[in-house]
Swiss-Prot record:
The active site is at 974 (glycyl thioester intermediate). Residues 15-26, 441-462 have a biased composition (Low complexity). Residues 312-327, 498-507 have a biased composition (Polar residues). Residues 463-474, 485-497 have a biased composition (Basic and acidic residues). This is E3 ubiquitin-protein ligase Nedd-4. Residues 52-175 form the C2 domain. Residues 15-58, 303-327, 394-539, 558-586 are annotated as: Disordered.
């Protein structure tokens, strides 16, 4: 279905980003399940082919108990002779698979296949893996016909019990089953059902042999590749976990992300990983887990637990390592980097250490040619040789192992996964290649040790200088402090190191951490009051200031000068978002998948919604709901007379370049005004849009711009501003047919009210009072002309005789002066205390009523031909303004709360977050233009976005996923829907959206 086009040429094709994996986080909100999961279609392999790199989709539900649960393989193959639902005799079928409980029919999980367009015999060939309990669960297959305009049509269902299903075994062939589609069991189900659904289903054989590696492996999760025989590789492990695995270690949990991939959560260290942990490597890395947990507490130092506050925290700088390895094709996975350190003022024998490492390296190579070289480097750092200096203990080296994000091309010095290791082994070309590889890795390892020793020496020099100076001026210098727990340090439990303190050149640089402020030191407090001796001040990565006591080697949030904690920072915005600071006590962070969430440290809660949406200065004034107005409007609509004996629609064919003249000619020529009350069908010349409400709103919007343009001389701006309009009393001098035009404008205003559209104009308050035939008082003058109002107020409150005024006013018409008597003989009547009230009343009547009486009479004549004037008298002047013109200021929070999402989008989707961030950064004018681009009108109804109207009545603002990042957004004004492509970044989305709004040219298709 076509839609409003942006009229802009799309940019070159951009790469589509890969989906981010979900990572378990403490208080980070979880998004709701997607409406339609990404599927793997077109796979026609046999059951034996699944081991060759093919990974089937898995259920989103993960049953994490080891009772009678097992894996069930489902392959949705084809459908035959389905029912016809589309008007052209075809359907767009897809299958929804529900995993339900037998008792209570409670839904556990749902997945969907892809939609096959315009066919009654679809072929899906999509495979799914469910973890089920056969005695408690069942599967329900429902076939639907996708419909983008209304709800999807039901084509039939199959209910499958799981008790007697076959199990896959080697040498056994399991056939496909064909099931007849049946209707729902509900009494009111009347859908026409026919056809069959072909399905393959079988339990996956789950044995311990499938999950256990060969006995020759030193680790249950890793395999070693023979370096001398690149052609021999171990068997490919099963692409999905099975029930044959050993039990998870204590504190671990198995989960699945939105794409069906299994990952493992370490609740002790609060980390996640793809590889399944075992009890062996869990115990061997317990101290590493403790260190990672400490790292986590430092990173989220705002809400550190009291039980963790006593732990000493190391501030380790990670050195980036240059890759001097020129051998192409090495498949290393950067995971961890090892950093060794020595306590301050302790000399280390670099040459001895490096020589011993080299000897052990060669000995290890000679003993076992199959050992992985990267494993040796990792183990040599975790288990140092016995002759190493006593100051460099195994614990200190082990604590230095930190996960870092290194630049591309940096070789790994940690154990790689079996697939990476196999890839590296396959590329081994012979003994010469192996020797060159050993030599290069050894050189790299020695170079890394030298770099670490040099960095430690620099750190010790900086630390010694800091201890000697004892002056606050050192706070302005950037340095790195390495602190190791000692016996006297372990007793201090009143503070906790808030974060790692590192130089910008060695600090992790991640896009996911772009909401944090880089760590820095400042000496702002030194200007007011110097810090005590041996104290310094720094800024944590989140922007909060903390203090360092070098005497006791402690850090604290408490300012030693006044005893108060440093204030929470207002998160610094990025340059593209000039939205102002966050409220006090709030912090913005970026989730692992790129979405932004907000932390309220006052209540210790997290949320996806930007708290600035509640700030009317940023998001716009809130729309006050009026129940009284709602009742009046319903009464008004019920008493409007419906036309009889008229055609189904009234066609209006116009040109955009002459919309005022064409509309005036068509509307003024209508003698039977009931025709104007029928359904409007607007067509713009040269455009193929079909008007189902959107084009009519566009017509009213564009015509309002022209009708009320002061350029034509019919209206003029009031003295207060340049957007509030009043009737030009000299309109007859600009247009001889001005009264006919005012009647035409009255008809347009009446048609807008009758059809529930809005005019893009705002009139002065006396204009609405004249429509309601209410008297105009002095207070109404204040909003039109403040100076004139102040003059009349002075006359009202003082004796006007000193001004020597008469009942006669001077009038300037196009430079010609003239006098107008407010009453007969007024030029000879002085204004006194006795008659000043009469004078003020006559001035107001002449200013607002008498001068424009003919124009207003023609306007009401045209308006009354559509809407009886007695019906609008139930409204006051404020409500009449909202009835005709809507609300000018747009409340983004109300807009967001009354928006629907379709496709894969939901309220917390990253694309939707970027969209609302862009809207929040827009000015009110740009928000109005966006609203006009999508709905056809720039005005909001009286009670907000909940009362937006579409082609068939109330229609909420809708955002649907569509297109590629190369496309511009497009709008369906008849449905108030914005088709928003999945852009790759916030700036790209904002730029494309602005260009689409500003480059909109017309309509094409249904609108």
């Amino acid at each position: 279905m076509s839609a409003r086009s942006s009229g802009l040429v799309a940019a070159a094709a951009l790469p589509v980003p890969s989906s981010s994996s979900s990572v378990a986080g403490g208080d980070v909100p979880r998004p709701p399940p997607r409406r339609r999961a990404a599927s793997v279609a077109g796979q026609q392999q046999t059951r034996q082919e699944f081991g060759n790199g093919y990974t089937p989709r898995r259920s989103l539900a993960a049953v994490n108990d080891s009772g009678d649960s097992c894996h069930l393989r489902i392959v949705v193959l084809t459908g035959q002779s389905l029912a016809k639902k589309d008007i052209f005799g075809a359907s767009d079928p897809y299958v929804r698979i529900d995993l339900n409980t037998i008792n209570g029919d409670i839904n556990i999980d749902s997945v969907l296949t892809k939609t096959k367009k315009k066919t009654l015999n679809p072929t899906w060939n999509e495979e799914f893996i469910f973890r089920v309990k056969p005695s408690e669960h069942k599967l329900v297959f429902q076939v639907f016909d996708e419909n983008r305009l209304t709800r999807d049509d039901f084509l039939g269902m199959v209910e499958l019990t799981l008790v007697n299903l076959p199990t896959e075994q080697e040498g056994r062939t399991i056939g496909e089953q064909s099931y007849t589609l049946r209707p729902r069991r509900s009494v009111g189900a009347k859908s026409r059902i026919k056809g069959t659904l072909r399905i393959y289903h079988a339990f996956i054989r789950e044995t311990r042999e499938q999950s256990e590696p060969s006995s020759g492996n030193s680790d249950g999760e890793w395999e070693h590749v023979e370096a001398t025989n690149a052609g021999e590789t171990s068997a490919q492990p099963h692409p999905f976990p099975t029930g044959g695995h050993d039990a998870l270690p204590a504190g671990w949990e198995e989960r699945q992300d939105a794409n069906g991939r299994t990952y493992y959560v370490n609740h002790t260290a609060r980390t996640t990983q793809w590889d399944r942990p075992t009890v062996l490597n869990s115990h061997s890395s317990q101290s590493t887990d403790d260190q990672l947990a400490s790292d986590f507490q430092r990173r989220f130092h705002i809400s550190v637990d009291d039980t963790e506050s006593g732990r000493s925290a190391d501030s380790i700088s990670h050195n980036s390592i240059e890759d001097n390895n020129n051998a192409a094709g090495l498949a290393y996975t950067p995971k961890t980097a090892a950093t060794s350190s020595a306590p301050p003022n302790t000399p280390t024998n670099n040459n001895g250490i490096l020589a011993q490492i080299a000897m052990q390296y060669r000995a290890e190579e000679d003993q076992d040619p199959t050992v992985d070289h990267t494993s040796f480097v990792y183990n040599s750092l975790r288990h140092p040789v016995a002759h190493r200096q006593p100051e460099i203990s195994a614990t200190s080296l082990q604590n230095d192992l930190r996960p870092v994000r290194e630049a591309p091309g940096v070789p790994d010095i940690a154990i790689t996964n079996p697939f990476t290791r196999r890839a590296a082994g396959n590329m081994a070309g012979g003994a010469g290649w192996q020797q060159e590889r050993r030599r290069q890795q050894m050189q790299l390892h020695i170079q890394q040790h030298q770099q670490r020793q040099q960095q430690q020496q620099q750190n010790r020099i900086l630390l010694d200088v800091d201890h000697r100076q004892q002056e606050p001026q050192h706070r302005g210098q950037r340095h790195q402090q390495q602190h190791r727990p000692s016996n006297e340090d372990t007793d201090h439990t009143d503070s906790h190191n808030p974060s790692d303190i590192s130089a910008p050149s060695t600090r992790r640089n991640s896009e996911e951490d772009n909401a944090a402020v880089p760590p820095m030191e400042q000496n702002t407090g030194g200007e007011e009051e110097p810090l005590p001796p041996r104290w310094s001040m720094q800024v944590a990565p989140n922007g909060r200031t903390f203090f360092i006591d070098h005497a006791s080697r402690r850090t604290t949030w408490i300012d030693p000068r006044n005893g108060r904690a440093s204030p929470m920072p207002n998160q610094t915005r990025r340059v593209e978002d000039d939205l102002g600071p966050l409220p006090e006590g709030w912090e913005e962070r970026v989730h692992t998948d790129g979405r932004v969430f907000y932390i309220d440290h006052n209540t210790r809660t997290t949320q996806w919604e930007d708290p600035r949406l509640s700030n009317p200065n940023i998001a716009g004034q809130a729309v006050p709901y009026s129940r009284d107005y709602k009742q009046k409007y319903e009464y008004f609509k019920s008493h409007i007379r419906k036309p009889t004996n008229v055609p189904n629609k009234f066609e209006i064919r116009i040109r955009r370049t002459s919309i005022l003249e064409d509309s005036y000619r068509i509307i003024s020529s209508v003698t039977k005004t009931d025709l104007l009350k029928t359904k409007l069908w607007v067509e713009f010349e040269g455009e193929t849009g079909l008007d189902y409400g959107g084009l009519a709103r566009e017509w009213f919007y564009l015509l309002s711009k022209e009708m009320f343009n002061p350029y034509y001389g019919l209206f003029e701006y009031s003295a207060m501003d340049n957007y509030t309009l009043q009737i030009n009393n000299g309109s007859g001098l600009c247009n001889e047919e001005h009264l006919s035009y005012f009647k035409f404008i009255g008809r347009i205003a009446g048609m807008a009210v009758y059809h529930g559209k809005l005019l893009d104009a705002f009139f002065i308050r006396p204009f609405y009072k004249m429509m309601l035939q209410k008297p105009i008082d002095l207070k109404d003058m204040e909003s039109v002309d403040t100076e004139y109002y102040n003059s009349l107020m002075w006359i009202k409150e003082n004796d006007p005789r000193i001004l020597e005024l008469t009942f006669c006013l001077d009038e300037d018409v196009f430079g010609q002066k003239s006098q107008h008597e407010l009453k007969p003989g007024g030029a000879n009547i002085d204004v006194t205390n006795e008659n000043k009230d009469e004078y003020i009343k006559l001035v107001i009547e002449w200013r607002f009523v008498a001068r424009v009486k003919e124009q207003m009479s023609s306007f009401l004549d045209g308006f009354g031909s559509i809407i009886p004037l007695n019906l609008i008298k139930i409204f006051d002047e404020h409500e009449l303004e909202l009835l005709m013109c809507g609300i000018q200021n747009i409340d983004v929070k109300d807009w967001r709360e009354n928006t629907l999402y379709k496709g894969d989008y939901h309220m917390n989707h990253i694309i939707i977050q970027w969209f609302w961030r862009a809207v929040l950064s827009f000015s009110n004018e740009m928000r109005s233009r966006l609203l006009q681009f999508v709905t056809g009108t720039s005005r909001v109804p009286m009670n907000g976005f909940k009362e937006l109207y579409g082609s068939n009545g109330p229609q909420m603002f809708t955002i649907e996923k569509w297109g590629t990042p190369n496309n511009f957004p497009r709008a369906h004004t008849c449905f108030n829907r914005l088709d928003l492509p999945p852009y790759e970044g916030y700036l790209q989305l904002k730029d494309k959206l602005i260009k689409a709004i500003e480059g909109s040219q017309g309509f094409a298709g249904v609108d």
